Design a protein with these regions (language model features):
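Catalytic core of tubulin tyrosine ligase-like
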Residues: 173
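Active-site-proximal cap/lid insertion segments
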Residues: 1-8, 15-170
Length: 177
């Protein structure tokens, strides 16, 4: 199956293999459309998650009674697939995330040893996903951790490893580098 992620990764790998990349500094932003509609990924990834359910715990029981009205309207407009068991089943979403993870690996593995020595690799996202928490799906005008707590993984050329637990913003990236 050929997807947008394949194309983006192929172009990124081709870019890294150009002779100029060995001699000149560069910035490369690799941005994938998955896991958004139409949730296109190879069938083997979909099969892997066909029976996968994400347990929401207490977040599945929120009736939104004490929440702003727009949350209730959002829940009505986009009904959550989460049942009384509190399990979220969306194999396409999880399959696309796994597929994109493999595509990111392809791009990182295409870096030459010399490029790895002086390249920052930053992995992040623009938003999270409600996945049925609080009876909501997708993203929207809410400040739940499900939407705002997104990954930010930075590998600096120096390879310094540490974890930062304080809130940060994308605006902090450039000063960090």
């Amino acid at each position: 199956t050929f997807t947008w992620a394949h194309r983006i990764s192929n172009r990124a790998v081709d870019f890294l293999q150009q002779p100029a990349r060995a001699e000149e500094p560069f910035l490369m932003v690799v941005s994938y459309d998955e896991p958004h509609h139409p949730f296109t990924c190879p069938v083997e990834y979909l099969e892997k998650y066909a029976d996968f359910y994400y347990e929401l715990g207490e977040k599945a029981q929120d009736d939104l009674a004490n929440k702003p009205e727009h949350h209730r309207l959002w829940a009505q407009a986009m009904p959550s697939p989460v049942g009384d068991d509190g399990l979220y089943h969306h194999p396409l979403y999880f399959a696309c995330n796994d597929f994109v993870d493999d595509q990111i690996g392809r791009v990182i593995n295409a870096l030459t040893p010399e490029q790895r020595e002086n390249t920052w690799v930053i992995y992040t996202s623009d938003h999270g996903e409600m996945m049925g928490a609080h009876k909501l799906i997708s993203k929207g005008a809410a400040m739940y951790d499900d939407i705002t707590r997104i990954p930010l993984i930075i590998r600096s050329p120096q390879g310094e490893r540490r974890q930062v637990d304080t809130p940060v913003s994308h605006i902090d990236l450039l000063p960090t580098m």
